[in-house]
């Protein structure tokens, strides 16, 4: 079967190629290859010649496959429109196929290629550096059109460079010959094309160094004594020296340029122009090899031989490197006076020009440079065209681009100058007319005005709002009818303009002219009625609906049964009985299924009400017999599927624990679930916070289950108790439990011992804790900066489950390396989770600021904060390891450890947090895998393959966090790979990890062990903390 399909496909492709080669001449308008900027729209036009009595059906192929139309890619008449072109999906060949509905003949156009213009990034690469030459390359990830090539500009310390003296610009390369101290600085490049302009992320810093060759005086047959093997010899260069490079001698003084080009000339586009270069050539040099050259922007433009000598071989060092040396009839270089004349100036002639005399064996003689500025004529590029807009489309654009000198201002008006643009229509900075939520009021004539000092030009386009035709009642079949009977085939359509309906039989159009009017009736609503059906009426009937927005077609099969085609009576009766029995069985099974489902629903409802009654009774006992109204009517628990409703404000905080043995149930599972629900509700009531205590809420992004805010919490609502004290208790208790000292008696002894130690704080650590307690007491009256996570997706069970998991994680840990959970706001939807936040915000933004990637300058400070030292990076990593070790000791896993999910304060205290801004701010760092947003570049292989999260997977992510710290978070892990490639390599075990270059050697081995495939071979957080502590101690020594 597969071989048959392949054979049919090859035959169809061969037929299409034959149609392309033989019938392309039948097209009146062929689709043309185009280059378009990414995210802009493009139209492929197609129209074929046809007999006026017949019609054509058009369809489009993309890379040999039929296009599936949607709101972004759709067909307008015979033309194809693509909105917001994407290079990953839309690049390729497009073929228009025209099918005659009368004869069924198909014609295919030659393929039209679509190229997408884009520009992503630029970087400076060092190709070579020595004392004679410095060679840099600007590497750009971009694609440009043939009409608008990629433009490269070089900068040294923010000053733009041009070809001058020892600096040469050669396409993407920068060549500096004989570099000296004057060439020291930071070199960057910018790249621009029709898609935009980018600057290199990191430049190249060049520092010239004194180069001298140390030489020791040595006579013939003289050997150095052995004692000299450890002597130190100094090499001192002469200040201001050239490093031993011999320059060419200066040319004779009587060979000189008398007058060079004007320093600044302004010429209108289309006017003639001439650049002057008067020179003096002595008689004694007439037979010498002398060449007159004109350069534009440092590149050789034209040259001519002077005197009676033979021409110079080649073009010296410029041979083969200057792309401007080409034939152009507009340019003429006059040998007699050195003048460079232009017959008519065009926009590309603008630039810096310089005249040069080159005498063989001598340094060139250069004139002063002159700048030619071209006043470009005001014009539209391209001319705006009319457009059909789809009704209710979320966004539609009409482009209007104008060029001229000075840069023109573009405006849009509707109908006339006195009519403003309608609602939801705006003009962006590039002059593009943007329609949002297209409606019928957007129809009309729109005029684009381009204005500058030259004057004003305008272009008027017609905007029409259309609705793609749709079947309101499509043909349904197959239809079986007896001979001489009547049959009705429905076909009704909606659209704007009102679509026309055309019927055909076996691809032959049907109309009142070619059918029996007494038997065939075409109703006004599009329905086809056939009376006195004949045997020849059997076949495939097609209904085609269409308007200016496109065409659609549906087929239905009509089967006509005659008396001679019937079965014997006994056989027919048997078939009818079988069909009836099958229908009865099917209906019986369906009815039984419905009854079963309804019964289960009623049973589940009864059980749920019984559980709620038991919960309400338990809550009443806990509250001392005062039952809230919400519990009485039983509606509180159904309003919020994630968390139970808060009762009576803060009343839950004063309730005591209930007896766990009360109200036992006969059903063990229900009893356990009731006790778990009671315990969870009791915990959430202990965490209750009033919503009025939150002030100055500012949204900073969106997470996996709702919006994320930063605000302030009143100091009176912040629970007392230092995390550092609880941290010490937690670690000491964990140590005791590991030593086997668990039990009620030992536990009370340990607590009393800890209390005694707290009363007698004499060590340096205890003194520091006392200072922290005093500082916290002083700041207790200040409002607390908090992070607020809203639970918007209350109907999403997966989001609710993740919300509860984060609550349990942060509620169960009290450590100075982990943010505190201040409480929950559950008075109304959405629920708020209130977490501790810091004044410096998340760690990733702090790292980017210290790396100079975030603009932190203000009016008083013009420099970015300095980058972190190795000691500071190790201190940050150590604090994160301590916080993660506390999470491990509490038997929890984080699952999304990264610098973006850590916070840092102005006191350089780092805490593990959980903002998880995966929907907007850090959406690049998440990828949807198996219908879930995952940070795949931070996840261990077992998390991606088996969805298994353990402490060892957190250790894997911690290794990536340390990699981020040493790279200042300036790039993503494996940013050269796409998300799909990262997943494939991780699952195959071929994803290779390397530590950052600035990582200390003592940490390389243990960090590499964090990324091994076997989770059991990865280190623990305590081992990582010990290694980091040793590394910090070694740096301090």
Curated annotation (Swiss-Prot):
The modification Phosphoserine is found at residue 680. Residues 23-582 are extracellular. Residues 1-22 form the signal peptide. PROSITE patterns: IG_LIKE, PROTEIN_KINASE_DOM, PROTEIN_KINASE_TYR. Glycans are attached at residues 23, 39, 337, 418, 430, 445, 458, 513, 525. Residues 618-681, 719-764 are annotated as: Disordered. Residues 653-675 have a biased composition (Polar residues). Residues 724-735 have a biased composition (Basic and acidic residues). InterPro entries: Ig-like_dom, Ig-like_dom_sf, Ig-like_fold, Ig_I-set, Ig_sub, Ig_sub2, Kinase-like_dom_sf, Prot_kinase_dom. GO terms for cellular component: axon; plasma membrane; receptor complex. Belongs to the protein kinase superfamily. Tyr protein kinase family. Insulin receptor subfamily. This is Tyrosine-protein kinase-like otk. It comes from Drosophila ananassae.
């Amino acid at each position: 079967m597969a071989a048959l399909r392949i054979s049919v496909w090859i035959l169809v492709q061969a037929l299409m190629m034959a149609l392309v080669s033989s019938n392309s001449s039948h097209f009146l308008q062929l689709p043309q290859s185009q280059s378009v900027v990414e995210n802009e729209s493009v139209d492929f036009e197609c129209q074929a010649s046809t007999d006026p009595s017949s019609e054509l059906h058009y369809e489009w192929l993309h890379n040999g496959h039929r296009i599936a139309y949607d709101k972004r890619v759709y067909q307008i008449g015979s033309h194809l429109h693509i909105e917001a072109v994407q290079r990953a999906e839309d690049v390729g060949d497009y073929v228009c196929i025209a099918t005659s509905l009368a004869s069924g003949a198909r014609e295919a156009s030659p393929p039209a290629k679509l190229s997408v213009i884009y520009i992503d990034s630029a970087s400076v690469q060092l190709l070579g550096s020595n004392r004679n030459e410095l060679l840099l390359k600007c590497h750009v990830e971009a694609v440009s059109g043939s009409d608008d090539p990629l433009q490269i500009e070089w900068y040294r310390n923010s000053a733009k460079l041009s070809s001058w003296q020892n600096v040469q610009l050669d396409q993407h390369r920068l060549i500096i010959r004989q570099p000296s101290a004057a060439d020291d600085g930071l070199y960057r490049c910018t790249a621009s094309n029709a898609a935009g302009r980018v600057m290199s992320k990191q430049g190249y810093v060049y520092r010239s160094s004194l180069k001298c060759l140390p030489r020791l005086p040595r006579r013939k047959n003289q050997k150095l004594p052995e004692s000299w093997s450890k002597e130190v010899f100094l090499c001192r260069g002469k200040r201001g020296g050239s490093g031993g490079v011999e320059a060419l001698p200066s040319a004779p003084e009587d060979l000189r340029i008398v007058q060079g080009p004007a320093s600044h000339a302004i010429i209108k586009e289309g006017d003639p122009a001439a650049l002057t270069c008067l020179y003096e050539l002595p008689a004694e040099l007439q037979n010498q090899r002398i060449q007159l050259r004109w350069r534009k922007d440092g590149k050789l433009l034209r040259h001519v031989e002077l005197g009676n000598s033979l021409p110079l071989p080649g073009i010296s060092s410029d041979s083969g490197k200057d792309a401007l040396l080409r034939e152009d009839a507009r340019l003429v270089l006059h040998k007699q006076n050195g003048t460079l004349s232009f017959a008519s100036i065009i926009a590309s002639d603008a630039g810096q020009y310089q005249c040069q005399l080159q005498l063989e064996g001598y340094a060139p003689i250069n004139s002063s440079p002159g700048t030619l500025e071209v006043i470009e004529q005001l014009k539209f590029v391209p001319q705006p065209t009319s457009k059909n807009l789809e009704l209710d489309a979320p966004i539609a654009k009409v482009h209007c681009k104008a060029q001229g000198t000075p840069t023109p201002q573009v405006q849009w008006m509707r109908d006339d100058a006195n009519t403003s643009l309608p609602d939801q229509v705006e003009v962006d900075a590039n002059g593009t007319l943007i329609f949002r939520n297209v409606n019928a009021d957007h129809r009309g004539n729109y005029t684009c005005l381009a204005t500058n000092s030259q004057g004003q030009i305008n272009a008027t386009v017609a905007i029409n709002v259309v609705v793609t035709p749709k079947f309101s009642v499509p043909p349904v079949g197959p239809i079986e009818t007896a001979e001489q009977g009547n049959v009705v085939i429905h076909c009704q359509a909606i659209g704007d303009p009102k679509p026309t309906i055309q019927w055909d039989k076996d691809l032959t159009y049907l109309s009142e002219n070619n059918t029996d009017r007494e038997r065939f009736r075409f109703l006004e609503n599009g329905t086809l009625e056939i009376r006195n059906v004949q045997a020849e009426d059997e076949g495939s009937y097609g209904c085609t609906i269409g308007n200016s927005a496109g065409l659609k077609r549906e087929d239905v099969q009509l089967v006509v049964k005659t008396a001679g085609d019937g079965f014997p009576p006994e056989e027919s009766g048997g078939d009818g009985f079988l069909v009836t029995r099958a229908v009865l069985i099917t209906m019986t099974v369906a009815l039984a299924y419905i009854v079963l489902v309804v019964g289960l629903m009623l049973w589940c409802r009864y059980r749920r009400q019984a559980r709620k009654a038991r919960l309400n009774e338990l809550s009443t006992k806990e509250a001392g017999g005062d039952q809230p109204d919400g519990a009485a009517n039983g509606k509180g628990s159904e309003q919020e599927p994630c968390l139970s409703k808060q009762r009576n404000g803060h009343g839950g905080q004063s309730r005591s624990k209930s007896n766990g043995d009360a109200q036992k149930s006969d059903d063990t599972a229900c009893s356990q679930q009731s006790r778990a629900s009671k315990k969870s509700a009791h915990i959430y009531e202990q965490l209750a916070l009033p919503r009025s205590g939150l002030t100055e809420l500012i949204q900073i992004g969106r997470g996996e289950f709702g919006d994320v805010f930063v605000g302030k919490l009143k100091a009176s609502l912040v629970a007392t108790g230092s995390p550092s004290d609880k941290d010490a208790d937690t670690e000491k208790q964990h140590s005791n439990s590991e030593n086997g000292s668990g039990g009620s008696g030992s536990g009370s002894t340990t607590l009393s011992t800890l209390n005694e130690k707290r009363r007698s704080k004499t060590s340096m650590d205890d003194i520091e804790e006392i200072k922290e307690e005093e500082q916290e007491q002083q700041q207790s009256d200040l409002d607390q900066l908090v992070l607020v996570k809203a639970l918007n997706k209350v109907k999403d069970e997966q989001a609710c489950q993740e919300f509860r998991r984060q609550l349990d994680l942060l509620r169960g840990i009290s450590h100075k390396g982990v943010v505190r959970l201040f409480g929950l706001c559950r008075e109304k939807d959405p629920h708020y989770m209130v977490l501790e936040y810091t004044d410096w915000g998340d760690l990733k933004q702090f790292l980017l600021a210290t790396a100079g990637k975030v603009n932190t300058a203000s009016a008083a400070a013009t420099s970015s904060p300095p980058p972190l030292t190795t000691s500071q990076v190790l201190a940050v990593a150590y604090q994160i390891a301590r916080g993660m070790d506390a999470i491990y000791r509490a038997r929890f896993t984080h699952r999304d450890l990264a610098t973006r999910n850590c916070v840092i304060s102005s006191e350089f205290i780092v805490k593990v947090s959980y903002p998880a801004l995966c929907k907007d701010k850090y959406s690049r760092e998440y990828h949807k895998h198996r219908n879930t947003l995952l940070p795949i570049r931070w996840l261990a292989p077992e998390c991606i393959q088996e969805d298994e999260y353990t402490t060892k997977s957190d250790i894997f992510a911690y290794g990536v966090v340390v990699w981020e710290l040493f790279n200042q978070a300036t790039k993503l892990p494996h940013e050269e790979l796409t998300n799909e490639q990262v997943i494939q390599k991780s699952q195959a075990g071929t994803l290779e990890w390397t530590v950052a270059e600035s990582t200390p050697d003592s940490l390389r081995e243990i960090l590499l062990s964090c990324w091994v495939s076997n989770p059991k071979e990865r280190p623990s957080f305590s081992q990582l903390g010990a290694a980091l502590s040793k590394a910090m101690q070694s740096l301090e020594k």
